[in-house]
């Protein structure tokens, strides 16, 4: 079975593109003069026939093929733990600097004013 995008197959997108092009050509040809105006009927009929063919003669079966049992393998195991250890060291260093420069910041007494 073909891959799906947003839960639908590629046929839905093909039909959507066909009808968008049909709508665009119909609007453009309706503004035309002479015999070109009657091509709107031909464009609409071709889009309708193509849509019916795609709907009634699908290439894939209705029931999906049975899924194979997939084995999940963590190939980035060592790299993930290396990154988390580096991030932990950086976090602890930042906590140390917050402690030194923010919490232990000296509070100076205000000078007493003489009247």
From Swiss-Prot:
Gene Ontology, cellular component aspect: cilium; membrane
Family named by the database record: Belongs to the TMEM218 family.
Membrane topology: Multi-pass membrane protein
The organism of origin for this protein: Xenopus tropicalis (Western clawed frog)
Stored InterPro entries: Tmem218
Biological function: May be involved in ciliary biogenesis or function.
Keyword Nuclease belongs to the record: no
Annotated transmembrane regions: 5-25, 38-58, 81-101
Subcellular location(s) of the protein: Membrane; Cell projection, Cilium
Main subcellular location: membrane
Stated name of the protein: Transmembrane protein 218
This protein's UniProt keywords: Cell projection, Membrane, Transmembrane, Transmembrane helix
């Amino acid at each position: 079975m073909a891959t799906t995008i947003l839960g639908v197959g590629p046929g839905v997108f093909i039909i959507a593109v066909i009808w968008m092009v049909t709508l665009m050509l119909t609007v453009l040809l309706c503004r035309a003069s002479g015999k070109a105006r009657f091509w709107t009927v031909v464009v609409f009929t071709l889009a309708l026939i193509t849509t019916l063919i795609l709907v009634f003669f699908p290439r894939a079966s209705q029931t999906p093929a049975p899924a194979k049992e997939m084995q999940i393998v963590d190939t980035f195991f060592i790299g993930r733990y290396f990154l988390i250890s580096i991030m932990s060291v950086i976090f602890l260093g930042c906590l140390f600097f917050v402690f030194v420069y923010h919490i232990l910041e000296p509070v100076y007494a205000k000078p007493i004013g003489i009247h």
